[in-house]
Design a protein with these regions (language model features):
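Extracytoplasmic gate region of multi-pass secondary transporters
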Residues: 91-158, 211, 215-216, 229, ...
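Cytoplasmic loop-to-transmembrane helix junctions
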Residues: 31, 137, 227-234
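Interfacial helix-cap and linker-helix signal at transmembrane-aqueous boundaries
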Residues: 4-8, 12-27, 128-129, 159-164, ...
Length: 324
């Protein structure tokens, strides 16, 4: 489920690159405008289709029978929400910024990976252009790294869910992406084409993954649906703001090598990995402290979230997604 939130980022790079090449080869003078119009129209159509088809909740899911709806409700009260389909309260939602004290750390991690993510998704063609190929081949060469990135996105997301762990998964993958930026900053990729192109694969392998894992991480530790709604919208928005930073480091003044841009992306990526590990270690420490205080051995998921209405203030609360 979490992987579906970001797979579009990878696949969009594949489709748009192929679309641009096809239109350009068709000798259309406004190929850029056509590509953007077609991509935008497809996005709007799918969004409208989702609005019409997708149910508002599991209870309204027309494709589930009564038994399946009951199972869905059980899973949500067991592992997701303190109260399912609760009435929206703006005061309750805003209180998240006062009571959920870890949100600034989530935000900082989002800042760090956001610069890397938007640099890859927006400027990968400029990076690959350093290999020395023409426009058409450069666009085609962006397809393979994005496909590999999509595959790793699915695999790592499933792994993260299977092990119920977020911290190490985020840190490892963003580190891989950062190493790719270090390679690009340290070598002349027009003279070392294979190494440079491999570094582009490293960017896509690790660059897209932190986004869905981070969103899942703070949602896993926010059982109140009102607080979850406001935190999700706020943290996603603040992470997306980092697109402004990426657009101001990949500039004509730093072309064609973009060495400083690569160094900045790598630095923020490594910082995000350190913050992710720090948060993971804190959750491990706090869970162990709570177990010692109670003389029990509990982990996240042992206590139904329906019984944890006070969140981390509850004595039996255990953080989910930290280092095991």
């Amino acid at each position: 489920m979490e992987s579906s939130r970001s797979t579009h980022t990878c696949t969009d790079g594949n489709i748009s690159s192929l679309l641009k090449v096809c239109i350009r080869n068709g000798v259309t003078c406004c190929w850029k405008g056509c590509a953007n119009a077609l991509s935008g129209a497809a996005t709007f159509f799918v969004a409208l289709l989702g609005l019409l088809i997708l149910p508002k909740s599991a209870a309204d899911a027309y494709f589930l029978n009564e038994e399946e709806k009951a199972v869905a409700l059980y899973r949500m009260v067991q592992h997701s929400s303190s109260e399912v389909d609760s009435k929206f309260s703006i005061s309750q939602a805003i209180s998240a910024f006062k009571t959920d004290y870890l949100w600034p750390l989530y935000m900082l991690i989002g800042f760090c990976y956001g610069i890397t993510l938007f640099s890859i998704s927006n400027f990968l063609p400029l990076i690959i252009e350093r290999l020395g190929y023409g426009t058409v081949k450069t666009n085609l060469l962006t397809v393979a790294p994005n496909i590999v990135g999509s595959v790793f996105l699915m695999l790592v997301s499933f792994s993260s869910d299977f092990f119920r762990e977020r911290s190490i998964h985020i840190a490892v993958m963003v580190t891989i992406s950062s190493i790719g930026f270090v390679i690009l900053a340290c070598i002349n990729i027009s003279e070392h084409i294979a190494v440079g192109y491999f570094a582009c694969f490293m960017l896509c392998v690790g660059g897209f993954i932190p986004s869905p894992l981070l969103y899942s991480w703070f949602n896993n530790n926010t059982p109140d649906e009102n607080k979850r709604a406001i935190l999700t919208s706020f943290l996603v928005s603040t992470a997306n703001m980092m697109g402004i930073v990426s657009s101001n480091i990949f500039t004509p003044a730093t072309a064609p090598d973009y060495n400083m841009a690569s160094i900045i992306c790598a630095a923020f990526g490594f910082a995000g990995a350190v913050l992710s590990l720090a948060l993971g270690f804190y959750m491990k420490y706090d869970n162990a402290r709570r177990n010692r205080a109670q003389g029990v051995v509990l982990k996240a998921g042992d206590i139904p979230t329906s019984e944890l209405k006070n969140g981390w203030r509850h004595a039996e609360w255990r953080w989910m997604g930290g280092i095991p």
